[in-house]
Amino acid sequence: MLSLDQIHLLLNTPEDCYIIFGIDNITLDIIGVNNDDNRRNEEDLTDLLHKLFISTNNQIKISIQTETIDNKEIDILIIHDTDKVPVFLTKDYKPKKDTALPKGLIYAINGSINTPKDSSAPFELINELFQKFNHTDLNIKEQYFHVLKDYKNWFFIENEDGRFFIYNPNPDFYIKLNDDDANRFKTMSYSLNQYQTNIDWQLVQLRYRHLTIDECMAMYLDQGNCLVPSPEVESFKIDYQETIYYHCLYKNTLKYQLLKVFSSIPGLEKYPLTRFKNSIVIYDTKLELKKTHNLINSKFSSKDIVNQLEVTEKDFDFYYKKARHKNPDYSIQENQVNLTELNLVRLLKTQIIHTSLN
């Protein structure tokens, strides 16, 4: 059986932890859980954990992976890594046939030694857990990613020194926006659906005190009504001869977190942001991209895909005139490429839903 002190030990660690059910603890023989009356599914265990008097019980994430060996099923309980540490009891726990666990004590694994049930982990180990909670155990670039995830605590300021996003809990973290004068495209596929199609490019500097930790490009869309990071470019192969490029963002990346920070500026219109998101693909992971590409290539022939990406004369004329109004250098070739990309984006977005269900 899984005990409460074991849960504490496994939560107060630096990585995912695993408990295997269906293997004898002493002989290591595979006995299986096929007929085990104590077997629990993921939903049952999650519900049980949320009822315990644990400081972060609602933050605990688990999953169960079942494997079959010699026709015997074993369950692998994965307790996923969390930064909501140290974990401790909020109320005394007194099991009928085991040692009582006092509230407030912190159990952890120190090397190969478990914290005794009537004691707390040593100071050095508790300090490491608090460093994990505050992300100070990470390098500065990884720390930056975590403060960006706290996007509601950033605020925008513009003064004679420039334009900045500042992190309220720790102003040593701040973002500086700089006008970019390089000769770049003035119109992109994801700006065509804006009321104003021209782009104002920005150099984004992620700074910590006087140091620049990272840089990337961003742009104001719709005459400054929306600020977004420059999306990534990916390729889709129709066949061995033809490849089409399109723009996307990946969740759980620095650029996606920047998008959330930029979107939190008070007073900005929400519609330009919606139009931008509709013009790119937002993936959970690279694996989702691969699944989506494979699904399209399995469902449609190359000819069918080409037909779905074909730009209508009506769309071509409309967007060409619209873009040329603000950008006289906008060419017929650019327009064809951009509109083909938008058609590909629409196709990809319809298939992402299917991959998430498989």
Specify the residue positions occupied by each region the protein language model found.
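Intrinsically disordered, low-complexity regulatory tails
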Residues: T56-V147
